[in-house]
Amino acid sequence: MIKSYERLKKLNKEKTRVPRTVQDTIPVDTIYKDGIFRSGNKYTKSYRFLDINYKIASGEDKNNLFLSYSDLLNSFDSSVMTKITINNRKVDIKRFKEDILIPLKQDNLDPYREEYNNMLLDKLSESDDIVQEKYITVTIFKSSIEEARFTFSRIATEFSTLFARLGSSCIELNAEERLKMLHDFYRSETEEFSLDMNDLAKKGHSFKDLITPRMSKYHNKYFEFDGKFGRVLYLSNYPGFLKDEFVSELCDLNKNLMYSMDIITIPTDEAVREVENKFLGVEKNITDWQMKQNRNNNFSAIIPYDMELQRKECKEFLDDLIVRDQRMMLCNITVVHLADSLEELDKDSETLKAVARKYVCELETLYFSKRQLDGLQTALPIGVNKLNITRTLLTESAAVFIPFRAHEIMQKGGIWYGQNAITNNPILCNKALLQNPNSFVLGIPGSGKSFLTKEEIEFLILSTNDDIIIADPEGEYDPIIKAMKGQIIRIGTNSKDYINAMDMSEGYGDSGNAIADKSQFIMSLFEQLDTNHGGISPIDRSIIDRCVSLVYQDAMKNNFIPTLKHLYGKLLEQSEPEAKSLAIKLELFTNGSLNIFAHETNVDIKSRILSFNIFNLGKQLKTMGLLVITDAIINRVNENWRKGKRTHVFIDEIHVIFENEESATFFASAWRQFRKRDAYPTGITQNVKYLLSSQQGTSMLSNSEFIVMLNQSANDREDLARLLNISEEQMGYITNAPTGSGLIKYGGSIVPFVNKMPKGLLYDLNTTKPGDRKLLIN
């Protein structure tokens, strides 16, 4: 007899009560605001844990996750009961539409909003409308709520550490969240739920009135409430070997379903004693059998196979407990699922049983109405276990029922980035919830990076009031800027649109010294002027810094707007020969034919939607143009920040900025400023190698919380895998990937996605395929 288990059974035992009302079927007496439920001296609390990408992890990563999950199971105290639950919950489509669809604004952009909304609705109809939520519920036995709170606080700290090792996180549920979970199961997600405990007390109502169905009946093999039919199944037979995909496939049913695994751990000393007693019994049986054979003069008889097997199993079990630090666990698994009709329920039950048979397991129906009720109460994450059906497992065997499958990103206020390639659910990313909103879009030509970027820009234009600024080296974004009534500033050798490279707004820079930061920018420009790529010397830096400071002092004193021409003049005034050399380098760009950045700004850059088209700049000026545009964007971001307005910045062909050290340093500083000034920067490039060849570029990419990776070249794949810790299995999603498919790194998670936009107004604006463009022109 295992004393700890018998003690728990005794504590858990309740008087048999025949429920007289629907409310009586909820085995909870009292609820507390912090999420603790009480029934007698039994206290329970639930924690939600986030899913992780187990299905697409490499073999080595899966093994590490399996070991970490085993550590989690081993951490369960033998004085508590633990329940791990997977809740297949149908999405409330009405509420989901309210969150994701773009409201119409009765302006000339509404046709685009309508098309975008129709696209989203079509994609939603293709996806599964089931979301998996995962919970761990702990049941303890204490004499007071204070003792219970202290214990749950310690458990929460342990869980937080152990789930972090798995790459997941653990969130405590309060009373409203726990009750909503039960409400959604009993009454479906379509009904509104809110909890006001003070209001309940005033009206003399029970919290159970908010969550229970209006009618419930329990039958021999199923139950029903409010027009829904349900059935509880339990796992009655386990194989000797089980694959870790079992739970994932079992919970793939696209219906309301709850899977629960109840676990009670046994202290190792009691477990060893129990196995030793069984081992002694097996040895006694073998000895008795041998003595019987000897009495019959059968001295060479071989011990029967079943006895040898029992002996071997006992020895292995003892070794596992003593040598391999495994723990004995008493487990039972229940599944409850719902359907709209009895026929549908029978069909779904057979589907679940077929999955179990595939893995040489056996799912059986709980017979009798009382058992269906007991099974339902056990399967729900309330914290009770009313089924005396347990199977003895070691930690390793229990860990095979691993509850992880694939990480989902479906956040309120998020932008649509396609569908999860594993679960087919929408991917909705809200960058505001990340530690920083810095982003990159990476992919070879033709992989769909500009198309995806344009989709994001369109969503921001149509659904927010934020400012959008684009640095467009190839003129790719002109069609959407024109269609969305934005402003295009064309900067080129024959253009009359000018941007002053010496413009400086209030609050410029991130060091607190605006002049020093502007000097860094000017140094990056001079590095672009050096055709020998030898860089600028320390003497050059000192001269530039001095002259920039003098130019701004003169400008403030004499009230004029400084330009590169003023800097050119100031360099000529200096006595050092190096200053003359710097002035000569600058001459072509101030008084010569490439002087487009040496004029005062003559264009209005206050438009909400602004694109800098530098397609006609020419190769010699393109990098310089990107730097000047970035500097102008810094000024605009600072102005918006002072007004409390968010800015989204998109910089295409960002890799060219990292071709030399000074421009890379300046841009890294700009990247930091964007984050501090509530700007969301996105860098787009097809040349990952250029980006990673710079220490600044590598740092920016590795510290960015949001990265979209489309199809990559072999070398780029390897570099990204090393930098971002991408597994071989995950790399398969960016190897010869179809257009619009790849991986999204969101915070610490990497999710495979598929994003295909149907042909229409938005597709026509976004496409860069020569065939599609030709058809549009015709």
Predicted regions and their residues:
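Conserved P-loop NTPase
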Residues: 724-777
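Post-Walker A helix-loop "phosphate-sensing" segment adjacent to the P-loop in P-loop NTPases
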Residues: 459-469
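Hydrophobic anchor at the beta1->P-loop junction of P-loop NTPases
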Residues: 441
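P-loop NTPase motor domains
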Residues: 52, 59-78, 85, 89, ...
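Hydrophobic positions on the alpha1 helix immediately C-terminal to the Walker A/P-loop
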Residues: 452
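A short helix-turn-beta junction within AAA+ P-loop NTPase domains corresponding to the substrate/partner-engaging
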Residues: 485-489, 696-709
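Conserved lysine of the Walker
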Residues: 449
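Extended, folded cores of ATP/NTP-driven motor/assembly subunits in large transport
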Residues: 1-404
